[in-house]
Amino acid sequence: MLKIFNTLTSTKEIFTPIKKNRVNLYVCGVTVYDFCHIGHGRTFVVFDMIVRYLRFSGFQVKYVRNITDIDDKIISKSTKEKKKINTFTASMIKEMHKDFDLLGISVPDEEPRVTDYIDNIIRIITTLIKKKHAYIHKNGDVIFSIDSDPNYGTLSRQSLTSLESGSRIPLNNMKKNPLDFILWKSSNKEEYSWDSPWGKGRPGWHIECSAITNVFFNNSIDIHGGGSDLLFPHHENERSQSICFNNKSMINFWMHTGMVILNNKKMSKSLGNVYFLRNILKDCDAEVLRYFFLSTHYRHPIYYCEKNLDQAYTSLKYLYTALYDTNPFFNNEEGLNFELEFYNAMNDDFNTPAVFSIFFKIARKINFLKNKDILKTNKFAFRLKYLANNLGFLFQDPKEFLQKKTTLNLLTLKEIQLLIEKRNIARQSKLWQEADNIRKKLMSLDIILEDLPDKTIWRKNKKS
């Protein structure tokens, strides 16, 4: 019996699909103004895992993940690069797919682009105006009135009063309430606008998802997902306008992934600590990064550092070492007790850390049986590979994986050597504090120095 944590109720609930054995799943996708970063990777690996498991469990899943291909950031970036928007977004979408393919993220059943659904967006906005949930400013902007929805704030568990009192958004002559948000943004630039009853313009961010879910699911959604950074205001606004349009909510479960933490700070472009997936994957095996993403429960923050990537590599190395020199392609009933444990862990809100511990138990069994009973060894190897494959793991040839360069180095070998040389120069100049600071910096990255009579050598600290 599958239980999923529902953000709306803040409880784990038994998952019962709206239609038996069918799951409608929608995830907010990427705004394609730049390359995908580690936060995108974490969220979409998580929902890829969820889709894989639901299908493994016998559900027919319709998975839709949108692409936002028009907004202010896209306009700014395409203008800066002197490219037409369609050309720019097409290239960014292509790069997104490259990154996701490397991580083993399956292509959704549908990947709608916002600009293909402008008519649907206009239709919903028109209805919201008629129902007095939205108003038109004289400049052509259409704005949603949060005061028209008495349940606004329910998803993020915030009252309208507290939101208004805590708002730092200055009241302007456009909005009746500082928290009101744009449904349609007026624009006279031909390339960036569409005709509407209110004049030329383009859609606001929040209305896009409401329109797309209406088209593909008629707002009948079992699971709606995204990163926790989208909970407020994006998902709150999306939920509010969708309910006001339909007169009811047809989203059963809201799911949110935890933030990526870098140096004890959440990842943010404003903080300048964004790590692009493609840069990480230059030095890190993609399966190691995927394992890292799922080594922490999806709802919890995940701490990105070299040490944790090393741990992910070490874990995968153990599993591949167990599979090495086995023939895991013989379907059998050996190890079904482990499969039951696997189901129990996954049915507990997709508890992947518990699943990984089950994989280790099977691997230990394989290692124990090696050189004792090759037939049983292969049977348990099949069970390990079968279960892991269904979450996107252990597809590589064990020998090839074990021979690869293993994990991300935040410092390259050349950079490490340059720091050691800089430290040696400082020591020769008796700049002891500078030399010690370099040593401490390397230690913080689990690099241990050893000073010999004629040189300094280094090694990774594998005990940490």
Curated annotation (Swiss-Prot):
Origin: domain of life: Bacteria
Cofactor note: Binds 1 zinc ion per subunit.
Class of this enzyme: ligase
Record: residues binding ATP: K269
Chain sites annotated for binding Zn(2+): C28, C209, H234, E238
Required cofactor names: Zn(2+)
Annotated EC: 6.1.1.16
Catalytic activity: tRNA(Cys) + L-cysteine + ATP = L-cysteinyl-tRNA(Cys) + AMP + diphosphate
Transmembrane segments: none
GO MF, any single term: ATP binding
Any single biological process term in GO: cysteinyl-tRNA aminoacylation
S-S bridge residues: none
Location, primary (coarse class): cytoplasm
Family recorded in the similarity comment: Belongs to the class-I aminoacyl-tRNA synthetase family.
Protein name per UniProt: Cysteine--tRNA ligase
